[in-house]
Amino acid sequence: MQPKYKIYATLLDSYFNYLNSDVIYERYYGWSENPPCTEEEFQQKQFQELIDRINRKPFDSEVADKGTAFNEVIDCMIENRKSETVQVEKIYSDIGNGEQKVIALKAVYNNRSFVFPISLCREFANYYKEALTQQRVEAILPTAYGNVLVYGLIDELMPTSVHDIKTTGSYTCLLY
């Protein structure tokens, strides 16, 4: 069953955002007296982002880098290994009597530094301690347009669930 198309989740998100650009624009900017762009400009931006995704054009995003760094820190803790892509350092606090304790982890990725509280890192690592990390998955789906290969990476694969780790307090579209 040879696929006619190959699609991944972020590409589907970009396509959805383009198709629904009028609704998204209204939700985020419809109330504004001085929106940053017109609805037509917003639609054109969504179209260009879709084209850039199709062409896999690299993009620079501090928010995405923070998520990548955090995910790698957690995966390293789960797998008890050192990272090959993120430089990680412990941040200490004096607790008296010449003793120190780790209070955070500093992660450097793409020349950007991020600090994650050790309590948060431990909470995530403990929760996902039995997970399989960064699992590539794919499936061929028959559609009216031919067979489609849908593929992607799972951050954390648990026995009965799939988890996509985010470093934002509220995940919504168009965040980065």
Regions found by a protein language model. Give the residues of each.
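Conserved small/polar residues in nucleotide/adenosyl-binding loops
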Residues: Y176
